[in-house]
A protein has these predicted regions:
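ABC-type ATPase nucleotide-binding domains, specifically the catalytic core motifs of the NBD
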Residues: 14, 32, 70, 95-114, ...
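The feature captures the beta-strand-to-loop junction immediately N-terminal to the Walker
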Residues: 35-37
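Helix-to-loop junction immediately C-terminal to a conserved catalytic motif
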Residues: 50
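Conserved ABC transporter NBD signature motif
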Residues: 58-66, 78, 111-116
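Conserved ABC ATPase signature
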Residues: 133-137, 141
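ABC ATPase C-loop
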Residues: 150-151
Length: 236
């Protein structure tokens, strides 16, 4: 079943076209990876899906409903959350307060408390540091906090924008392991990532973007085996 369907999406910033007639879909239960170099349009696509950027053309369907003109907070309420590039945690708030910000649309206190327990179960470091300001966390821990904050809204679809960017190698594999665990627990994932090798290794399917256009698609294994992808993104 298709959870997200993007058809003929275009995004402009003034006279600059960042996304050109892009179409793809994400089926329920999948991890789908979008890979491409800087400037390929990946982040603009995610921002359009999450309601932060209004596309200039095209259609975005989430759970059968068009959302390209829906306000961002209503998209979150419908079951879609994004972890932005660069994490963007609230540095002056504690870990717990950051998590509570992720549940701002949910009024059921018991449900929120249960979700905090789930986040701490998945990210034990966050429980150890729950009363610390987010600014005191390492980059990897801040990424875990950003992911935990997004999961507080119990999304059906999680959008991840460059989750391994700027992280120490010890944290990178842990983040990708966590993404797989999130999928196993029933959350569908759309992943944008410059680390094409790791992104495709965990992906059910992938799309390759160049200068705002989809130029190649296939299963994660097919794209990893593609000579074109290896030369452009995998160093060989």
């Amino acid at each position: 079943m298709s959870m997200l369907k993007v058809e003929n999406l275009s995004v402009h910033y003034g006279m600059i076209q960042a996304v050109r007639d892009v179409s793809f879909e994400v089926n329920e239960g999948e991890v789908v990876s979008l890979i491409g170099a800087n400037g390929a349009g990946k982040t603009s696509i995610l921002r359009s899906i999450s309601g932060l950027v209004r596309p200039s053309a095209g259609k975005i369907e989430f759970l059968g409903q068009e959302i390209q003109k829906v306000p961002a907070q209503k998209i979150v309420a419908a079951g879609l959350s994004q972890v932005p590039e660069g994490r963007h945690v609230f540095p002056g708030l504690t870990v717990m307060e950051n998590l509570e910000m992720g549940a701002f649309l949910k009024k059921d206190r018991e449900e929120n408390q249960a979700n905090v327990k789930k986040v701490f179960s998945r990210f034990p470091r966050l429980e150890e540091r729950k009363n610390q300001d987010a600014a005191t966390l390492s980059g990897g821990e801040q990424q875990m906090l950003a992911m935990g904050r997004a999961l507080m809204s119990t999304p059906k679809l999680l959008l991840l924008d460059e989750p391994s960017m700027g992280l120490a190698p010890i944290f990178i594999q842990e983040i990708f392991d966590i993404i797989q665990d999130i999928q196993k627990q029933g959350t569908t994932v759309l992943l944008i990532e410059q680390n094409a090798n790791k992104a495709l290794a965990i992906a059910d399917r992938g799309y390759v973007l160049e200068t705002g256009k989809v130029v190649l698609t296939g299963t994660g294994k097919e794209l990893l085996a593609s000579e074109e992808v290896r030369k452009a993104y995998l160093g060989g």
